[in-house]
Amino acid sequence: MRPALLLKGFEVELFTGKPSGENVGVASEVARQLPGFVTEPDRRNLEYITEPEASYDRLEEALLRPRRTLRQWLAPQGLTLLPGSTLSLGDSDRFERSDPTNPYHSLIEATYGTRVVTASVHINLGLTDPELLFAAVRLIRCEAALLLSLSASSPFIGGQLSGQHSQRWRQFPLTPEHVPLFINHRHYIDWVEEQLATGAMRNERHLWTSVRPNGPDRPHSLNRLELRICDLVTDPADLIAITVFLELRVMALIEQQSRLDPLCSSELSLDDLAALADQNDAAASRISLEASLNHWQDGRSIRCRDWIMQLLESMEPTAERFGLLERLQPIRTLLKHGNQAMRWLDVHAQGHSISALLSDGAIAMEQQELVIHGESAALG
């Protein structure tokens, strides 16, 4: 009998637009007509959330089903789903409000402008034990740059090269500016209440960092880890592989907390660890897998690609025990051939336009939605 897997789910943001890659905002209309879709402050992107699933077969179908539904709605209007995590061909200087009457959206536009008009995927892992949850948040905060590097898909902005592999993370307003590594649940509660009192956070959701604890009544009632750093990963096999990588890393922590919790096993102070994690994230946003990072254990320099490979090799026996070895294999392909941003930049350097890359990517997304791993959705 296989060990139990964690519950997990996705929060997926998507851009809509023309097959040629230009952004066209229809989020308000979609949210009114299609259950399960919600608007973002800008109408050019929208969001859906999957229900928690332990099974990766069911999780993959939960990921793809809303995309198919949305695609059917878009097609008669000559629109499609677009890859990428920034306004690759869109007007990045102009905000297009999805709800002009919403005061919170007014605040977002006035404070951040189009820096928040991005597409991403947040990965949630169910963890109800507070001690384990905060240990996992600490570890994944210190290794979040690895997951950003695997997912990077935003090398373009406004029809130009951005100079970054993840322009989304480069421009996204981390809020508050400095977030500590939380020692425990009480530390987190006290810190959030202090941020709310000073106005550094406008509400309990206004914690925009690479990873955070989440739950039905933040900051008090928590039941999951939310990884927020990843760019949009449109290939379901790649996203599932990244999720398996994340889950197996947390599983290793559960089995070896004293060795893998940075609070217990790092030579650095918590303040230094927080600074190191943020610096690694910034380095990964620039050149992703080629970035030189610093390891949380002792601050030593290590290439991002090499660090991921070390972890991958260490977790493959556990992946086999959980029946997840095949699901994990796309990580090796990403390390060999590059993430979406790197592959796009290689093809762009050969003379292909951004429009052509987005058009090909949109077609690939549609083809990927026809593939179901494991059982047929009709049986579920």
Regions found by a protein language model. Give the residues of each.
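Short proline/glycine- and acidic-rich turn/helix-capping motifs at secondary-structure junctions
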Residues: 88-90, 154-165, 262-271
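Active-site-proximal loop/turn and secondary-structure-junction residues that shape catalytic pockets
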Residues: 85-89, 129, 231-233
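Metal-dependent DNA replication initiation modules
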Residues: 84, 104-121, 125-187
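C-terminal accessory/tail domains of diverse enzymes
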Residues: 1-79, 92-93, 101-105, 170-380
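Core alpha/beta catalytic barrel or barrel-like domain that forms the active/cofactor pocket
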Residues: 7-15, 40-49, 78-89, 113-124, ...
